[in-house]
Design a protein with these regions (language model features):
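Non-heme Fe(II)/2-oxoglutarate
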Residues: 6-90, 100, 108, 133
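Short Gly/Ser/Thr- and Asp/Glu-enriched loop/turn motifs at secondary-structure junctions
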Residues: 92-95
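Exposed beta-sheet edge/beta-hairpin loop segments within beta-rich domains
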Residues: 163-166, 185-189
Length: 192
């Protein structure tokens, strides 16, 4: 067998397959300051014995102060649901929610996923350059064995084994719940 390689000046069309995604939008809340204050109280009041090792206490989605936020995230979930071609016979709802700050929380520091959902979202009502990034891990765990760092000139969706997303004020990030992710507070310079 003989392989012939031709050098061409035209660019190939590269089509990703088995796509993963993150969707990003800004959410402006009329009651953002109240949500932030209420969230800080929830963190300090949390009565879960092992708060730091098990994650945060799940919040009541029907809490009146959270209504606008829950409604907007559900709208985002359903827009995403429609855009990726899921059945119009089904709707997405927020089934659980919790609040984190920039402090040490081993539950979000370890790579994890949310196996009970289809989509997950992270909303930052406050953020600054000191916030730790949200890190997503490529589900193709062979990536780092194939593309050694010395081979990569520009990191992109085809050659990266992880992606860091820097939080922005009012930003909401939607992603598939099966996508492994974490927040390394070692990288954080603030508690936002």
């Amino acid at each position: 067998m003989v392989a012939i390689f031709l050098k061409t000046k035209t660019r190939m069309n590269i089509n990703p397959i088995f796509s993963r995604f993150v969707a990003v939008e800004n959410i402006d809340l009329k009651n953002k300051d109240e949500v932030v204050s209420w969230s800080k109280e929830e963190i300090s009041f949390d009565d879960t014995k092992n708060y730091k090792s098990t994650g945060t206490n799940h919040l009541n989605r029907d809490e009146p102060i959270l209504k606008e936020l829950v409604d907007k995230i559900e709208l985002g979930f359903n827009n995403l649901h429609n855009q990726i071609g899921l059945s119009s016979e089904h709707k997405q709802i927020v089934s659980s929610l919790w609040v984190n700050d920039g402090s040490n929380n081993t539950a979000i520091e370890a790579p994890h996923r949310h196996v009970d959902g289809i989509f997950s979202a992270v909303y930052w009502p406050i953020a600054d350059n000191g916030c730790a990034p949200l890190t997503f891990m490529n589900p193709n765990n062979q990536m780092s064995y194939v593309f050694k760092s010395k081979l990569i000139e520009v990191h992109n969706q085809f050659n990266s084994d992880m992606v860091n997303l820097q939080p922005q004020i009012n930003q909401c990030v939607y992603f598939p719940s099966w996508l492994w992710h974490y927040v390394s507070h070692v990288l954080s310079k603030t508690n936002n």
